[in-house]
Amino acid sequence: MNCDGNPRVPMSLMCTAFAPGQMDAAVAGIADADSRAIATAEALYFRGQAALAAEAARPYLDAADPALRYSACFICGYASLSLNRIPDARRCLASILDAPPDEESPAVHAMHILFASAASVLLHLPSPYSAEEFYPLAAHLPEGLRLFASYVMAHALYLRGEYGRSLGMAENALIMKQGSYPISELFLHLSASMACMSLKDIDAAKAHFETAWSIARPDGLIELIGEHHGLLQGLIEACLKQQYPDDFARIIETTYRFSYGWRRIHNPDSGEDVADDLTTTEFTMAMLACRGWTNAEIARHMGVSPGTVKNRLSGVYAKLGIGTRAELVAHMLR
């Protein structure tokens, strides 16, 4: 219970409505001290300050209150990927997967299904729960978390190659929302951008990404953009590199840090071999190439010459020890 005697909600910042640019005020306005501490950890995480986020959330890893515990495990788990603390990440994420007792409230079961699914899907691993198991409990969560749940389900559809359904899930959530929840909306616009890129609707992908950036930039929310780099298939380069060079550099630094730790869990647990020795530019070009883009199309999208694309892809083949585009698929994100 919080200081008002009401049940706490997990990820209190994600659940707080505020206008972009007002995140610090939103955190300060949370009355309950423990919920405010979690919101502080969220703000640090989404700003790319993984070490400080983990430090702020760590005291709640064994909290009796499930809202505080799930929040802390989720924040510390993903922050530990960027910090290359893989045993810590595994411990935190494993704690999320532990099912609550049957006698717990529907709200607790809803938050468990959501965070257990998110902990798996965001690592591109199979979710322990289906959407059908979540739907009857969804109404027990606040709107900010329901929006995040829509992102998790959209991401799962994307991983199954159901790009149209993934896009519909994200866009419907954005259309139907009532309040302004920048964190969850950022997740959803990035998901929609991913789906549009895979459907080769570049204009729609850019529109969603530009909206995501308009949400992220006022509060410095670079972490999620960096984490989604490979799945955004060149949108970061196309939309930010020239106009926002300093922000772009920070985002790419975030990408390298997070993706290194992410692969330390994803690759052994999935049996896949997502490449870990490519630059972000090489990885993006390789992602587009294995999706059937021509060198000329890749060049136009990324603002370089076809010759540059050809040379970069030749370097990719050499690093991966392969000789054809068909062989790229085994080393790329889905």
How should each PLM-predicted stretch be described?
Residues 1-70, 222, 234, 241-245:
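Flexible inter-repeat linkers and adjacent short helices
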Residues 2-9, 34-48, 70-85, 108-125, ...:
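Tandem amphipathic alpha-helical repeat scaffolds
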Residues 4-24, 42-58, 81-95, 119-134, ...:
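Helix-turn-helix repeat elements of alpha-solenoid scaffolds
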Residues 130, 145-185, 189-280, 296:
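Linker/hinge segments immediately adjacent to helix-turn-helix/homeobox DNA-binding domains
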Residues 263-314, 318-334:
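Helix-turn-helix DNA-binding segment
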